[in-house]
Curated annotation (Swiss-Prot):
<keyword id="KW-0963">Cytoplasm</keyword>
<dbReference type="InterPro" id="IPR036894">
    <property type="entry name" value="YbaB-like_sf"/>
</dbReference>
<dbReference type="Pfam" id="PF02575">
    <property type="entry name" value="YbaB_DNA_bd"/>
</dbReference>
<dbReference type="GO" id="GO:0043590">
    <property type="term" value="C:bacterial nucleoid"/>
</dbReference>
<comment type="similarity">
    <text>Belongs to the YbaB/EbfC family.</text>
</comment>
<dbReference type="InterPro" id="IPR004401">
    <property type="entry name" value="YbaB/EbfC"/>
</dbReference>
<protein>
    <recommendedName>
        <fullName>Nucleoid-associated protein FTM_1023</fullName>
    </recommendedName>
</protein>
<dbReference type="GO" id="GO:0005829">
    <property type="term" value="C:cytosol"/>
</dbReference>
<keyword id="KW-0238">DNA-binding</keyword>
<dbReference type="GO" id="GO:0003677">
    <property type="term" value="F:DNA binding"/>
</dbReference>
<comment type="subunit">
    <text>Homodimer.</text>
</comment>
<comment type="function">
    <text>Binds to DNA and alters its conformation. May be involved in regulation of gene expression, nucleoid organization and DNA protection.</text>
</comment>
Length: 112
């Protein structure tokens, strides 16, 4: 078996660059979660920071608990969208494959 250390280092550097790019894309991402057929919307970044909450005026006369439930549902919707759009584990597998590294399946990466 011919082992080329410089090739392995180059592959690792390429994978590291791709991971940094994927992380930056996630941090710059914005998603909108909604509930109540769009009456409550939450804008969230890929870092899970809530940028804005919008509540339709028609809900202002509703019961406080209903409004709280709709806000919670909109936040949860936004969180789910961030997670769906940031497939860290599958990105790592793809990057490794592109770099010629065969990772075993079933590894749970901690940065999802």
């Amino acid at each position: 078996m011919n082992f080329d250390m410089s090739k392995l280092v180059q592959q690792a550097q390429k994978m590291q660059e791709q991971m940094k790019k994927a992380q930056q894309e996630r941090e710059n991402m914005e998603v909108i979660g909604e509930s109540g057929a769009g009456l409550v919307t939450v804008t969230m970044t890929g870092k899970y920071d809530v940028k804005s909450v919008s509540i339709d005026n028609s809900l202002m006369s509703e019961d406080k608990e209903i409004l709280e439930d709709l806000i919670a549902a909109a936040v949860n919707s936004a969180v789910k969208k961030v997670e769906e759009n940031s497939t860290a584990s599958s990105d790592i597998y793809k990057m490794a494959k592109d770099a010629g590294i065969d990772l075993p399946s079933g590894i749970n990466f901690p940065f999802k």
